[in-house]
Amino acid sequence: MGFVKVVKNKQYFKRFQVKYKRRREGKTDYYARKRLTVQDKSKYNTPKYRLIVRLSNKDITCQIAYSRIEGDRIVCAAYSHELPKYGIKVGLTNYAAAYCTGLLLARRLLKQLKLDTLYTGTTEVDGDEYNVEEHDDGPGAFRCYLDTGLMRTTTGARIFGAMKGAVDGGLNIPHSTKRFPGYDNESKSFNADVHRQHIFAHHIANYMKTLEENEPENFQRQFSQYIKNGITADGIEEMYKKAHEAIRADPDRAEIVKTKEPVKKRWNRAKLTLSERKDRVKQIKASFQKKLEETEA
């Protein structure tokens, strides 16, 4: 069949059906969302949980959510801006930070569901594949599916670092090693050591050493926050190891205590009370009377 030009006449516009709002805005992939939210009919009211990972310029967001008619409901959430509490004060958007955020989410969720002692995950971070083993004499492992949104699922992407952290934290997420750093597409082999190096930010440490030797000025500029906080290339791995232990020890969200009340800014005049309005009228009358007396005199 040859090319048929669409005739945009009255009948075309009369029958035209617009796409969903979030599709028009380019925010939601409904093809993927349908498959991530629709549950098997035999499971009745059991929701299908999703691990939502979103990246921004300054933050990494990890959420566990499920879909309802009125909208999605968030069960638990963790953010990379919480990591300074655990000793990670710099590099809050790199692969290692994504892993820590996923680990924090998993431990926080399991503690919320009182499954943290039953499913501890793995404490040996070797970068290799790990899957949670379910217990026969207790509740099953928490199962969810990775929701990447509109992000490109390239090998070594940070979204898979967050997923790996959640899996090591004790969540049951179907996955393979094909998208982790260290997977070679040509030989179809996976090098777990390369993945481990990314989890502990060895690639950043190596770049720090190279830049410090060859371009000291650029090193001072690019790693100014590392220098300010006294973080060296040799101490990065130890920093992340301590952070993993601290996250497992206390995954609870820290309550924000406001020490001082915010200063309210007002851009319009405050509304006068009845007594203030009457007093204002009296003042206007008095000033007007005074002007009349001055002109007569």
Curated annotation (Swiss-Prot):
Record keywords, A-Z: Cytoplasm, Nucleus, Ribonucleoprotein, Ribosomal protein, RNA-binding, rRNA-binding
Name of the protein in question: Large ribosomal subunit protein uL18
The UniProt record lists the keyword RNA-binding: yes
Species annotation: Lysiphlebus testaceipes (Greenbugs aphid parastoid)
GO molecular function (one): 5S rRNA binding
InterPro entries associated with the record: Rbsml_uL18_euk, Ribosomal_uL18_C_euk
Subcellular location: Cytoplasm; Nucleus
Keyword flag Nucleus: yes
Subunit details: Component of the large ribosomal subunit (LSU).
Gene from which the chain derives: RpL5
Main subcellular location: cytoplasm
Family: Belongs to the universal ribosomal protein uL18 family.
Cellular component terms per the entry's GO annotation: cytosolic large ribosomal subunit; nucleus
Cited function: Component of the ribosome, a large ribonucleoprotein complex responsible for the synthesis of proteins in the cell. The small ribosomal subunit (SSU) binds messenger RNAs (mRNAs) and translates the encoded message by selecting cognate aminoacyl-transfer RNA (tRNA) molecules. The large subunit (LSU) contains the ribosomal catalytic site termed the peptidyl transferase center (PTC), which catalyzes the formation of peptide bonds, thereby polymerizing the amino acids delivered by tRNAs into a polypeptide chain.
GO biological process, one term: translation
